[in-house]
Structure formats: structure tokens, C-alpha cells
Curated annotation (Swiss-Prot):
InterPro entries: Arch_Rpo5/euc_Rpb5 (IPR014381), RNA_pol_subH/Rpb5_C (IPR000783), RNA_pol_subH/Rpb5_CS (IPR020608), RPB5-like_sf (IPR035913)
Pfam families, A to Z: RNA_pol_Rpb5_C
Any Gene Ontology CC annotation: DNA-directed RNA polymerase complex
Protein name (record): DNA-directed RNA polymerase subunit Rpo5
Gene Ontology molecular-function annotations: DNA binding; DNA-directed RNA polymerase activity
GO BP annotation list: transcription by RNA polymerase II; transcription elongation by RNA polymerase I; tRNA transcription by RNA polymerase III
Localization per record: Cytoplasm
Organism from which the protein derives: Thermoplasma acidophilum (strain ATCC 25905 / DSM 1728 / JCM 9062 / NBRC 15155 / AMRC-C165)
High-level lineage: Archaea, Methanobacteriati, Thermoplasmatota, Thermoplasmata, Thermoplasmatales
Record EC number: 2.7.7.6
Keywords: Cytoplasm, DNA-directed RNA polymerase, Nucleotidyltransferase, Transcription, Transferase
Main location group: cytoplasm
Length: 87
């Protein structure tokens, strides 16, 4: 079976790993604590695709998602990798 990188599909938004150095600034800007960010499963196909490039992504890592928007050009969302909500 051929492997397919979901991040290459035009309907899948860009996913980026947020460097640890930037996490504090993002959380401060959003006025939120990391545990209150929406969650993304470590088994999500986009996370698996990022792991193929960057290696294992640990829980607690913040993922930046950039979605194309017809009204705003693009919109940015943040998710934290966490499996406890998906059990």
C-alpha cells in the first residue's frame, strides 16, 4: 500500500510544531494555560505525518494550525498534544 502524507492534501490545514521557546509567549498572548488549550490526539494523522519528519512528538507539545479562510485570508489555531481526553 502506498504511503500518503495527509499534510500534502489541499483540504488539510498546515500543521507546525511550536518551539518550546515560543510556547510561553503564545500562551501569554492568548491569556490561557496550556491545559486549557483544545487537544489533538497523538494518533491524529497530521501528528503522525509531523512525526515522520521531526521524530516523536511528546505529549504537551503545542501544534499551530493555519487554516485558509475566505474572509480572513488565514486563521491560526493552537492545539496541545494529549491522549488523556481520548481514552
Amino acid at each position: 500500500m502506498a504511503k500518503f502524507n495527509v499534510l500534502d492534501h489541499n483540504l488539510v490545514p498546515e500543521h507546525h510544531i511550536v518551539p518550546e521557546e515560543e510556547e510561553k509567549n503564545i500562551l501569554k498572548e492568548l491569556n490561557i494555560e496550556k491545559e486549557f488549550l483544545p487537544k489533538i490526539s497523538p494518533n491524529d494523522p497530521a501528528i503522525k505525518a509531523l512525526e515522520a519528519v521531526h521524530g516523536k512528538i511528546k505529549e504537551g507539545t503545542i501544534i499551530k494550525i493555519v487554516r485558509k479562510s475566505p474572509t480572513m485570508g488565514h486563521s491560526v489555531y493552537y492545539r496541545v498534544v494529549a491522549s488523556e481526553v481520548f481514552k
